Structure formats: structure tokens, C-alpha cells
């Protein structure tokens, strides 16, 4: 059996009561207290996540912008220094290689943040399409990433830095910020549907940064959070998870992130199919389902109308915020109208559900 990969914070998990599981070959905490408590803390106060398993790749050189424009679906020429952009890499058939964030440091320096399970595959894909004048460097092992998410995140973080955090707007970042004596790339981004920050630092600095953030957040109700709450939070906000809402067989248009696909820019991998899907409508659509009958729609459960299979559940749970059994499902587009009644095959039972609006949770609602 191969040994699980560990983040620089692994030794701290036990100290904070973390329950460790195998997550795609990584030893990561699924929870510290309980998923519901951690979820609630992020929605009302704030939570601190270790997301150091994510991959970081530097793309540099005179041709970096041209290279990225061909590699990804969004228009990288639209971001300025200090801005971040959400985007995807696709195959020629429109299926998704990965979804990712791009940070622009300068015209010839970018940092890409990719999903942990896809690091090797993504880098191989990037190298396969590399051009002269571009360097691709995997800095994942020397980089740690923490996420402080929730309504009090800014107040807590401000006690540890002189950087005016209110000036860092959503999807903006500042490199070289001193937070509690640690040098951090600080980004106003996240994967929870809440306000918050993602903090990138050297792996060896991560434990001290984690401790300082927990300490500073104590009186504000900040708690350590695991992967379980990260998943329920992102699910309520309809943020896709690679391997569920996005796969090599599911396009960004189908998954509802068409805003990150700019078909009017110059040629990029997958453009032809994605342009067609955007203009004529994709054959499938990601929708929300709410159970009418009692049961929880889990990943992979099949969905039917009139005894015909029309799709499957990508993610489902009892929403901690709504207290309802809900799911995201990829359905044939003609069955995606709000209010449509469908049958979800939950184990051996056939249960009624209806198509509902998403996201299930929006900040400020």
C-alpha cells in the first residue's frame, strides 16, 4: 500500500482533533468537531482550512500570455497585475481537464492553482502544449495554502497584518504581505460562497501561520475546518468539484460555468465544441434537485422521467443551511425546467424530486 501524501500541517491535525481520511491519496482531515458545526461557523463567523494539497504551477516567460490564451477557456488578456481569474482547461471534445485559478503577477508571470488529484495529469497536459518562450514550474511541494473563510475573516486577518485588507477586492491579490511575520500571497478568493481569503506561503511557514490564525480567531468564533464542511459549503454555493460536476466527459458549459468560457477570443483547445454548446445550448445541464420524498440524493444516483434515464446526481446531501435534502444533477437539457418532477433511484427505492433554482445558498440572502 502506498503511503498517503501529507501536507506541512499534518502533525497539527491531532492537536486540533482532526479526523484524518484518505482523500485521493492524501491524508487530510474530514472534520475537527463536526461537519455541521464547521459549516455553520463558516456561514456565520469563519473557519480555517488546510488546502495545501492543491497544486501550484508557475507559468513564466515572454510567451506566457499567448500560451495561456490557447490553453484555457477564459480570456487571460482581460486580467491585470494583482488580479485572479477562474477558468478551465478543456480537451478538444469540450470535456474538462481541470478547473483552476490563474493569478497574474505580471505580463510574463502567472501562478496557476489546480486540483490536487489532477496535478500530474494537468502538468503533463500543460507540457504537451508548451511553446517556446514559456517555462512551466511545479511549485506545489514547497507551497502551502490556507483558507480563512467567513464573514469575520477580514476582521480576524486584519489583527495580524498592516496591509489594508478592505482594499483587496474580490478576486484580487497582493504578493509579499506580512501576516504574523510570515510572507504570504494573499488572495480574496475562496470555495465556500462566503467572503474570505486564501493564503499561500512556503511549506515550512504553514504551521506557525495556522497557529497564529487560530489564536487570533478564537474570540471571533473561528474554528478549524475539514474537507467535509468544505464540500457542503461549496455544494450549497454551486461551486463545481472536479470528478463530480466537472470531468473529462462534462464540459464547463454543461456544468454551469459558461461565464469562464469566452468563445469570442482567439483559438483555444476545445473552442469549436464549446462555441457550439454556448450558441446552440448544451445537450445536458447542471440543475438543483430537492427531494419531495424522504431520502438523500447521493453522487452517482440515476435520475429518471417516465422510466427513461435522463441523467445522474453529481453531488447531494442534507444541506446544513437549508435543512433540506438537495442535490446537483446533470440532466438532459429538455428536462431542466424549474418545477420538473423527476424520479431519483435511491438504492432500491424510486423517490420523487423536483428541479429547483440554484445556488442553494447565496451570501446576503
Swiss-Prot record:
EC number: 2.1.2.10
Keyword DNA repair: no
InterPro entries, per the entry: GCS_T (IPR006223), GCS_T_bac (IPR022903), GCST_C (IPR013977), GCV_T_N (IPR006222), GcvT/YgfZ/DmdA (IPR028896), GcvT/YgfZ_C (IPR029043), TrmE/GcvT_dom1 (IPR027266)
Gene Ontology cellular component annotations, sorted alphabetically: cytosol; glycine cleavage complex
Catalytic activity, as annotated: N(6)-[(R)-S(8)-aminomethyldihydrolipoyl]-L-lysyl-[protein] + (6S)-5,6,7,8-tetrahydrofolate = N(6)-[(R)-dihydrolipoyl]-L-lysyl-[protein] + (6R)-5,10-methylene-5,6,7,8-tetrahydrofolate + NH4(+)
HAMAP family named in the record: GcvT
Protein name from the UniProt record: Aminomethyltransferase
Amino acid at each position: 500500500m502506498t503511503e498517503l501524501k501529507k501536507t506541512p500541517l499534518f502533525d497539527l491535525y491531532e492537536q486540533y482533533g482532526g479526523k484524518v481520511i484518505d482523500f485521493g491519496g492524501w491524508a487530510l482531515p474530514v472534520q475537527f468537531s463536526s461537519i455541521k458545526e464547521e459549516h455553520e461557523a463558516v456561514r456565520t463567523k469563519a473557519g480555517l482550512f488546510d488546502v495545501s494539497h492543491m497544486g501550484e504551477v508557475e507559468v513564466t516567460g515572454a510567451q506566457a500570455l499567448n500560451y495561456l490564451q490557447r490553453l484555457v477557456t477564459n480570456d487571460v488578456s482581460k486580467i491585470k497585475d494583482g488580479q485572479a481569474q477562474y477558468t478551465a482547461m478543456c480537451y478538444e471534445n469540450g470535456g474538462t481537464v481541470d478547473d483552476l485559478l490563474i493569478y497574474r503577477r505580471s505580463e510574463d508571470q502567472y501562478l496557476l492553482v489546480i486540483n490536487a488529484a489532477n496535478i500530474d495529469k494537468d502538468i503533463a497536459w500543460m507540457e504537451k502544449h508548451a511553446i517556446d518562450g514559456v517555462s512551466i514550474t511545479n511549485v506545489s511541494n514547497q507551497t502551502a495554502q490556507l483558507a480563512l473563510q467567513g464573514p469575520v475573516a477580514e476582521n480576524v486577518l486584519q489583527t495580524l497584518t498592516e496591509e489594508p485588507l478592505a482594499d483587496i477586492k474580490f478576486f484580487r491579490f497582493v504578493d509579499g504581505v506580512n501576516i504574523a511575520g510570515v510572507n504570504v500571497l494573499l488572495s480574496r478568493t475562496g470555495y465556500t460562497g462566503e467572503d474570505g481569503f486564501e493564503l499561500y506561503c512556503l511549506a515550512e511557514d504553514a504551521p506557525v501561520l495556522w497557529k497564529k490564525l487560530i489564536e487570533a480567531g478564537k474570540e471571533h468564533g473561528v474554528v478549524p475546518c475539514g474537507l467535509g464542511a468544505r464540500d457542503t459549503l461549496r455544494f450549497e454555493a454551486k461551486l463545481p468539484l472536479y470528478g463530480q460536476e466537472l470531468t473529462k466527459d462534462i464540459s464547463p458549459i454543461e456544468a454551469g460555468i459558461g461565464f469562464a468560457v469566452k468563445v469570442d477570443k482567439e483559438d483555444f483547445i476545445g473552442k469549436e465544441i464549446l462555441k457550439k454548446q454556448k450558441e446552440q445550448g448544451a445537450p445536458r445541464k447542471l440543475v438543483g434537485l430537492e427531494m419531495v420524498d424522504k431520502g438523500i440524493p447521493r453522487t452517482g444516483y440515476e435520475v429518471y422521467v417516465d422510466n427513461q434515464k435522463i441523467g445522474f446526481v453529481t453531488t447531494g446531501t442534507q444541506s446544513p443551511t437549508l435543512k433540506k435534502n438537495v442535490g446537483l444533477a446533470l440532466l438532459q437539457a429538455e428536462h431542466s425546467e424549474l418545477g420538473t418532477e423527476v424520479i431519483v433511484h435511491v438504492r432500491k427505492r424510486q423517490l420523487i424530486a423536483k428541479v429547483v433554482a440554484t445556488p442553494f445558498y447565496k451570501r446576503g440572502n
